[in-house]
Amino acid sequence: KSLQKVESLLKTKSPRLITVSRFDKRKNHEKVIMALRNLKQTYPDIVYICIGYGDEEENIKDLVKELDLESQVMFFTDISDDLKNSLIAKSNIFVMPSIIHKTSVEGFGIAYVEAAQYGIPSLGGKDGGASDAIDNDKTGLICDGNNLDDVYSSLNSMIENRKYLELGKNAKEFVSKFQWEKTIELYKNILN
């Protein structure tokens, strides 16, 4: 899919949610899709962009069909970094309410930081590293990824009154602390 084609399609879709990750139980695409079914009632033009690949891809696509959400969910597997970055930049909320699956736990949430660079706030899960990358209720929200109502209400509260705009602005400021130049200066000051 070309960048122009995607951009013209996205012009009519809002709000825009995005996940960039492996299709893996721990990443919790299922709960986002189930929440999307309810969000669609209030926001009929909502779209969920899924970028990635993995073992759960077919199960996730089957769930989208089962819930009749094919016009709300866009899948991208093998795309250029330019297209990926453009899709992130054109999104409103980065969504990855990770959970603990078996013994697998989300590490530091670099994907949340990458989204924040574009001024995109995140919804992350309470389990794992999301809270290291998301300042709850300032740069995004942390929810219980195991609880569908919490995933839904967290997304709804970010969308309502376009709260994601304020959270995104804060996220862009917050992420600047992860930039190498600042880290190097901090170490120089400590060592001197």
Regions found by a protein language model. Give the residues of each.
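Short hydrophobic beta-strand element within catalytic cores of glycosyltransferases
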Residues: Y112, Q117, P121-G124, I134
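Nucleotide-activated donor-binding/catalytic signature segment of Leloir-type glycosyltransferases, i.e.
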Residues: S14, K61-I79, L83, I93
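Nucleotide-sugar-dependent
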Residues: I99-V113, S131-D132
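Conserved donor-nucleotide binding/catalytic region of nucleotide-linked donor-dependent transferases
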Residues: V6-S8, K13, Y43, L155-E173
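Conserved donor-binding/catalytic core segment of Leloir-type glycosyltransferases
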Residues: V6-K27, I33-L36, I49
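Acidic donor-binding loop of glycosyltransferase active sites
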Residues: A89-S104, I120
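A short, well-ordered alpha-helix in the C-terminal region of glycosyltransferases
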Residues: D45, D150, K163-K177, L186-N189
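Conserved acidic donor-binding segment of nucleotide-sugar-dependent glycosyltransferases
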Residues: D135-D137, L141-L148, S157-R162
